[in-house]
Amino acid sequence: MLEILKKYFGYNTFRPQQEAIVQSIMSKQDTFVLMPTGGGKSLCYQLPALLKEGMTLVISPLISLMQDQVNQMNAMGIKSMFFQSNSQKFPINQQMDNARFGKFKLIYCSPERLLNADFISQLKLLPLNGIAVDEAHCISEWGHDFRPAFKSIKGLKELFP
């Protein structure tokens, strides 16, 4: 684990609590992480994604954040993508094919994507090894009325045990 931490992230050691969190995720425990900004939360799901077979679905509320993380991961040699708005230029079926055959480790989507039954059906065909909700504090800070799609996340546990 430390070898992968050094190779991809450039750290020789974990920050406080990161190793225990990663171990919890690797043990297939549901894990809630609350750390301050800059505390290293993202690494807590990114590292297990590298250590496990398959890919991790990351649910993120902001397109710009998804794009930044995908760019950062790809620059580090970690294949990542995010599902863009369904359009003629980027049809969802093509994006799903990219996910299915592209050997990605991290795939990102907005909570609104989870409201689409076709998206969920196609997501079931992917070798998911975990689901992370990034920026989860936004749920309580922004309120359930601002992004009601966040409520759909609760059903993922049954669909992807």
List where the protein language model places each region.
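Conserved pre-motif I regulatory segment
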Residues: 1-36
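Walker A/P-loop
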Residues: 28-47, 57-60
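Loop/turn-to-beta-strand initiation segments
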Residues: 30, 54-57, 79, 102-107, ...
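Conserved Walker A/P-loop ATP-binding site and its immediately adjacent core
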Residues: 54-76, 81, 85-87, 91, ...
